[in-house]
């Protein structure tokens, strides 16, 4: 067993897999595991695995022990991650409450919502708080200027600020794409499916407050789009892959329940609305507590529009009658069929196959849980990029260390890098330098005076 295979097995174990770890422990280089986990922003999650090993494999650890100095360093970092999570949770709850009190519906994207799916929500390395606000760009900018300290920069999809020392991004919309056709389709999809996301309220751990987070049905599309965007920007890391693994596992449980009589299609609408999952499945490929903390509550004053109940364009094509809709819900595969159609419509189908390959190779996702067939060729490329670049591409050594260069040099190195991807993803790769150039001049034009 080589190092990287052992690392992948250890990640699965840290997420709750019950496979035998004796052979993995025997060949594990603990210092290399620490370096890998640090590069991929997974130190907290991996330390959870080490603590579990101490309880389940004490004799094996005696034969290949973790050095005391390394263990203490790792433990200290994990405690720091826990404290960071507690602070970010508190600020996320405060920010959500403040926005709602000021009459702005919103939801927290990725981040602390994703952490709730982990076996230990405090083990995920936190980042900034991304909050999607249900208002026009003008209203959000006017509000932000009154409530926050802003820099002079503005981006197409968000404003950057901070609250109580925690970086915050106020989103006009969740994500963008480089290709203008797919970007327009994506924004239409966001608008059609927005309403339920702002009313899907969950509780943060230890009384930190309540926030709205997107539904699993929304996340399975949105977070894949986020991965796709960052793949062409500076790269993605294993932390984002694990986030998406948990989303896919949660989605599988949701659509398996889609034949439940309590789940129905609204009359006069083609949109299917699954209930948020509430309990673990016990499957070895997903932690049993995957969805346990997602305690849905009443989401405030807005009512859920029939056209915004979780997926856009959900009907089986050519048949929207109420009678046929009931027949559609009798199949547990309906939601998967719909999502696959959305992936193709939004230009995500090939990338979805690559991600499924990575989830299978690294985390053992079984074929029956996949949202698309594995694409081995594109998947191997994606996995190589993840392993080389680390968290958001911060550790790239190829492409001229492009993430560590100045703006001018990085501009051309990014183009050079993305030309490597043209034969795999031509629409997005060829559009990337055009979009980035346009975005630069757009930012200059809209820069705060």
Spans of features found by a protein language model:
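Conserved NTP-donor binding/palm subdomain of two-metal-ion nucleotidyltransferases/polymerases, i.e.
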Residues: 1-127, 132-257, 333-449
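Intrinsic disorder/low-complexity segments
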Residues: 257-334
């Amino acid at each position: 067993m080589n190092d990287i295979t052992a690392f992948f097995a250890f990640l699965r174990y840290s997420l709750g897999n019950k496979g035998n770890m004796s052979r993995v422990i025997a060949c594990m280089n603990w210092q290399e595991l620490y370096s890998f986990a640090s590069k991929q922003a997974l130190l907290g999650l991996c330390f959870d695995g080490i603590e579990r090993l101490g309880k389940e494999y004490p004799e094996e650890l005696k034969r290949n022990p973790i050095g005391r100095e390394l263990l203490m360093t790792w433990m200290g970092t994990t405690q720091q991650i826990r404290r960071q999570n507690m602070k970010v949770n508190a600020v996320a709850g405060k920010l959500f409450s403040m926005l709602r009190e000021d009459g702005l519906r919103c939801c927290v994207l990725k981040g602390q919502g994703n952490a709730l799916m982990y076996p230990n929500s405090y083990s995920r390395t936190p980042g900034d708080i991304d909050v999607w606000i249900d208002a026009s760009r003008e209203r959000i900018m006017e509000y932000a200027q009154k409530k926050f300290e802003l820099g002079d920069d503005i981006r197409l999809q968000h404003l950057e600020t901070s609250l109580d020392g925690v970086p915050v991004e106020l989103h006009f919309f969740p994500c963008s794409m480089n290709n203008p056709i797919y970007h327009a389709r994506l924004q239409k999809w966001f608008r059609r499916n927005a309403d339920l996301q702002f009313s899907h309220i969950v509780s943060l751990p230890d009384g930190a407050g309540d926030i709205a987070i997107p539904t699993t049905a929304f996340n399975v599309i949105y977070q894949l789009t986020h991965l796709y965007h960052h793949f062409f920007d500076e790269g993605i890391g294993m932390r984002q892959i694990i986030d998406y693994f948990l989303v896919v596992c949660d989605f599988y449980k949701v659509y398996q329940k889609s034949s439940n009589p309590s789940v129905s299609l609204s009359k006069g609408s083609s949109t299917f609305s699954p209930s948020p999952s509430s309990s673990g499945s016990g499957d070895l490929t997903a932690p049993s507590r995957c969805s346990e903390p997602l305690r849905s509550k009443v989401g405030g004053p807005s009512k859920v529009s029939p056209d915004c109940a979780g997926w856009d364009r959900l009907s089986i094509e050519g048949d929207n009658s109420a009678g046929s809709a009931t027949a559609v819900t009798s199949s547990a595969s309906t939601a998967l069929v719909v999502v696959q159609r959305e992936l193709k419509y939004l230009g995500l189908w090939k990338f979805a196959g690559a991600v499924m390959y990575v989830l299978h190779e690294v985390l053992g996702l079984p074929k029956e849980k996949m949202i698309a067939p594995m694409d081995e060729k594109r998947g191997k490329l994606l996995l190589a990029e993840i392993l080389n670049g680390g968290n958001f591409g911060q550790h790239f050594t190829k492409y001229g260390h492009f993430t560590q260069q100045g703006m001018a040099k990085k501009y051309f190195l990014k183009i050079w890098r993305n030309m490597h991807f043209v034969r795999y993803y031509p629409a997005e790769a060829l559009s990337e330098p055009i979009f980035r150039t346009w975005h630069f001049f757009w930012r200059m034009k809209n820069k705060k005076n």
